[in-house]
């Protein structure tokens, strides 16, 4: 899973989910019980912080840190405008946290379809009408009686992808659930 916190033009994206990232990214090589935090900064570019993320020691440390954060949060006010406990200052502006439907990302889509003329055209037409740009598309070899279709999209607002996939799923030539995995390029 990848946890993402990003400032968008209309708010803050906060999300955790399975994510495909480029293999050449340093964070793609974090394995096992290790965790990493990738920070994109204007002055220095990307910086990576890497270390233990699971097991008795790291888990206990995280629990203690959470308890300390709760105890320190004595500056919380009734109107919900508390200060940041560790830094003891107030936010300069209120920036909304975006809903899942408002977030923007690319997608890996895998569809199992009947091997019929026009299926690919129907799928790409639905994506096009939703304003979804296709980055790459590949039709896999036949698997039993179905043809797997793999599509990578350019970044799109999730609500548009939800609507398009519902329309594609409703096509009578589509079998099984459509697989959707979010993509991140990590370049912004």
Where are these regions (language model features)?
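A conserved regulatory-domain signal marking ACT and ACT-like small-molecule sensing domains
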Residues: 62, 67-188
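Structured core elements
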Residues: 1, 15, 38, 48-50, ...
């Amino acid at each position: 899973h990848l946890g993402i916190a990003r400032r968008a033009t209309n708010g803050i994206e906060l999300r955790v989910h399975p994510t495909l990232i480029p293999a050449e990214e340093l964070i793609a090589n974090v394995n096992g019980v290790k965790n990493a935090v990738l920070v994109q900064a204007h002055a220095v570019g990307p910086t990576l912080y890497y270390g233990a993320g699971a097991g008795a020691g790291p888990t206990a440390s995280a629990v203690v840190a959470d308890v300390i954060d709760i105890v320190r949060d004595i500056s919380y006010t009734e109107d919900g405008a508390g200060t940041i406990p560790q830094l003891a200052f107030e936010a300069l502006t209120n920036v909304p946290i975006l809903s899942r439907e408002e977030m923007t990302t690319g997608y890996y889509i895998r569809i199992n379809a009947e091997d019929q003329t026009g299926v690919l055209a129907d799928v790409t037409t639905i994506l096009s009408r939703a304003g979804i740009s296709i980055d790459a598309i590949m039709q896999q070899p036949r698997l039993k009686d179905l043809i797997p279709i793999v599509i990578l999209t350019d970044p799109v607002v999730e609500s548009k992808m939800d609507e398009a996939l519902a329309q594609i799923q409703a096509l009578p030539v589509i079998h099984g659930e459509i697989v959707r995995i979010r993509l991140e390029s990590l370049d912004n």
